[in-house]
Structures are given as C-alpha cells and as structure tokens.
C-alpha cells in the first residue's frame, strides 16, 4: 500500500467520452499538483459506448500537453485505485446543485474507505457547466453535432460507434 501524497491527485470517472468540461477541470488542476492521475473506470454496469481502451486512448490524446498528467484505466474499487496511485487528493467536478447530493454521498463513503484522502471539488468554467458525457452520447447517437463539446478525436470515435450500431 502506498502512502497518501497530497501532491498527487486522482480524477476518476467513466469518461464515456471525455468532454471539454473534463479537459477544463484537468487544465485547471494540473498546475495545483505535482501529479494528476486521470482514472478511467471500467464501469461495465454503465454500458459504456466506448471500450475502456478507447476511452483511455482518447483521454491520453486530449491531455497530452500536460507532463504531470497521466491517464490510467482501472477496474477495481476506487479506494484501492487511489491508494495504488499513492494519491492524497480525490478530484471531483461539480457542475450544478443537482450533482451535489450524489457527490456528497460519494465523498462521505470515500472518507470512510480512504480516510487519509481528501476529496476536492472543482466547479467547471461557465461555458462547460452544462456539458455531460451522457448528453454528448445521446446527441451523437441521434446524429447531432457534438464538436463544440468534445475534441475532434472524440467526435470521430462517436461517429464510428454510431455507424457500427447502424450496420448491426
């Protein structure tokens, strides 16, 4: 087990897909920590549109400009992943009041599971406060333009998913 380091933060999520809101949060967190680990959760129960490997690759591409940011997939309990990474901070984004109740419950549970780790909430920049991966997936599934919400590589990945489902 690693010792918690307050200079290392884990930003977990499904990132199905990574959005400009996620990227904004990492852009703002990267200068605050020596190391930021973006933990891409396997989450098969959520029925992700993109495979874990694809989500990791898209996040790596989107965040490549940061030398202190690494992207890792994980399929364990978040508390175990955070300890494995030696992190002392768990980053979470809060878009709206509607996110707060869920995030508060998760932070409380994580405090019991990993008491040595603090949860830090960051709010998005205003232009990203309405973006969610689920909305992006739904717009893309229905053939809408998501280019204002995600990087070009994600637009292409979602187009490929839509085409493969149309052929199935």
Swiss-Prot record:
Cofactor: Mg(2+)
Keywords, comma-separated and alphabetical: ATP-binding, Coenzyme A biosynthesis, Cytoplasm, Magnesium, Nucleotide-binding, Nucleotidyltransferase, Transferase
Gene3D superfamilies associated with the record: HUPs (3.40.50.620)
E.C. numbers: 2.7.7.3
Annotated positions binding ATP: 14-15, 22, 93-95, 103, 128-134
Pathway given in the UniProt record: Cofactor biosynthesis; coenzyme A biosynthesis; CoA from (R)-pantothenate: step 4/5
Coiled-coil positions: none
Binding annotation for substrate: 14, 46, 78, 92
GO molecular function, one term: ATP binding
A GO CC annotation given for this chain: cytoplasm
Record's subcellular location: Cytoplasm
Major subcellular location class: cytoplasm
Gene Ontology process terms (BP): coenzyme A biosynthetic process
Reaction(s) catalysed (UniProt annotation): (R)-4'-phosphopantetheine + ATP + H(+) = 3'-dephospho-CoA + diphosphate
KW ATP-binding (keyword) present: yes
Enzyme class: transferase
Residues annotated as site: Transition state stabilizer: 22
InterPro entries assigned to the protein according to its UniProt record, in alphabetical order: Cyt_trans-like (IPR004821), PPAT (IPR001980), Rossmann-like_a/b/a_fold (IPR014729)
Alphabetical list of NCBIfam families matching this protein: coaD_prev_kdtB, cyt_tran_rel
Similarity field: Belongs to the bacterial CoaD family.
Self-association and partners: Homohexamer.
Protein role: Reversibly transfers an adenylyl group from ATP to 4'-phosphopantetheine, yielding dephospho-CoA (dPCoA) and pyrophosphate.
Protein name: Phosphopantetheine adenylyltransferase
């Amino acid at each position: 087990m690693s010792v918690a380091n307050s200079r290392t933060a884990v930003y977990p999520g499904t990132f199905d897909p990574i959005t400009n809101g996620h990227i904004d949060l990492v852009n703002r967190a990267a200068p605050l920590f020596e190391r930021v680990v973006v933990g891409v959760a396997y989450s098969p129960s959520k029925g992700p549109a993109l495979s874990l490997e694809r989500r990791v690759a898209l996040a790596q591409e989107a965040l490549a400009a940061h030398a202190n940011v690494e992207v890792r997939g994980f399929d364990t309990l978040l508390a175990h992943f955070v300890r494995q990474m030696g992190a002392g901070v768990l980053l979470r984004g809060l878009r709206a009041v509607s996110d707060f109740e869920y995030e508060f419950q998760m932070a409380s549970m994580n405090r019991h599971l990993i008491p040595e780790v603090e949860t830090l909430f960051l709010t998005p920049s205003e232009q990203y406060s309405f973006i969610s991966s689920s909305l992006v997936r739904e717009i893309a599934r229905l053939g809408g333009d998501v280019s204002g919400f995600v990087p070009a590589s994600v637009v292409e990945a979602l187009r490929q998913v839509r085409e493969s489902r149309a052929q199935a």
